[in-house]
Amino acid sequence: MSARSIHIVDTTLRDGSHAVSHQFTAEQIAAIAGGLDAAGVEYIEVSHGDGLAGSSYNYGWAALGDEEMLKAASAAIKKGKLTVLLLPGIGTVEDLKMAADCGAKVVRVATHVTEADIGEQHIGMAKKLGMMAVGFLMMCHMAPPEKVVEQAKLFESYGADYINIADSAGAMLPEDVKARVGAVVEAVKVPVGFHAHNNLTMATANALAAVEAGATFLDGACRGLGAGAGNAQTEALVGVLDKLGYRTGVDFYKVMDVAEDIVEPIMHRPQVVRNAPLMLGYAGVYSSFLLHTYRAAEKFNLDPRDILVELGRRRMVGGQEDMIVDVAYQLAQKRGGN
């Protein structure tokens, strides 16, 4: 039995934003952030689902601006570290400066698994601002372990404090996770983390596989609230890790109460593995495409599964949300011509 410490990064107020169409209110943000902080969660991520400056026609308009969200969370967090996500090309260094001014202590710079180089400027700026900087590699199922290692080493060379391996499509199985996380752990000198999605119901199993491979940071969300079928449930992760003898510093009862009393009442729908999220994982499609796909399917009277299969076949990646409507239109035209 190990006594190793595992750092919990809760993404309810960032990845969970996808599941509520980015409509968190300031009061909800303060309540969730304050509850997580009181429960001992070390890192509390708050942003639009697509990161700083994500509120847009393409990614979905948020109820609040970034500054309002961050100020609401910062006022409620007393011990934990306010964390933000930034996708280069969406968020800029100016957005990062604003986040730091609002109290953010950590930025996770997220790029496609083959594009770590576009995050160099943002990692560098974060370090200049005195922030903890994380290299966050998305859609890691799309690259073999050696490519993931190559990109992780780039992030390390830019000054990243740890590397996060993300199964953004919820497409990986435990052996896939072990292969990628284990290879990165062996190759870099900084810690390694893992971000799971539950599209194939493997989120907690994959998180544990990551820990077995040497990861020391794990992402979770209360009630699993997140894109697609959601993330690993923070409260479940804490309980499972405790049973296995790992230290998280999180009060199990308190984090369960946050999930049940604060998060669950504001969920738009149960975070379960329905057909379309299951297809996300099966086809290897970016989890935040889900609600966009539902809307396109309704508009063109299509089965969302058909759209997702085609998106997977075309190897669409995060940032190509605008292509969902194009694909749906093409499928509808093809159907009409048959």
UniProtKB/Swiss-Prot annotation:
UniProt keyword Cell wall biogenesis/degradation, yes or no: no
Binding locations of substrate: R14, D15, S168, H195, Y286
Family listed: Belongs to the 4-hydroxy-2-oxovalerate aldolase family.
Residues marked Transition state stabilizer (site): R14
Binding site for Mn(2+): D15, H195, H197
GO biological process: catabolic process; L-leucine biosynthetic process
Gene3D superfamilies: 1.10.8.60, Aldolase class I (3.20.20.70)
HAMAP family in the record: HOA
Enzyme Commission number: 4.1.3.39
Positions annotated as active site in the UniProt record: H18
CDD domains named among the record's database cross-references: DRE_TIM_HOA (cd07943)
Every Pyruvate carboxyltransferase domain range: 6-256
One Pfam family it belongs to: DmpG_comm
Keyword tags: Aromatic hydrocarbons catabolism, Lyase, Manganese, Metal-binding
Leading EC class: lyase
Lineage per the UniProt record: Bacteria, Bacillati, Bacillota, Clostridia, Moorellales
The protein's name in its UniProt record: 4-hydroxy-2-oxovalerate aldolase
GO molecular function: 2-isopropylmalate synthase activity; 4-hydroxy-2-oxovalerate aldolase activity; manganese ion binding
Listed InterPro entries: 2-IPM_HCS-like, 4OH_2_O-val_aldolase, Aldolase_TIM, DmpG_comm, DRE_TIM_HOA, PYR_CT
Reactions performed catalytically: (S)-4-hydroxy-2-oxopentanoate = acetaldehyde + pyruvate
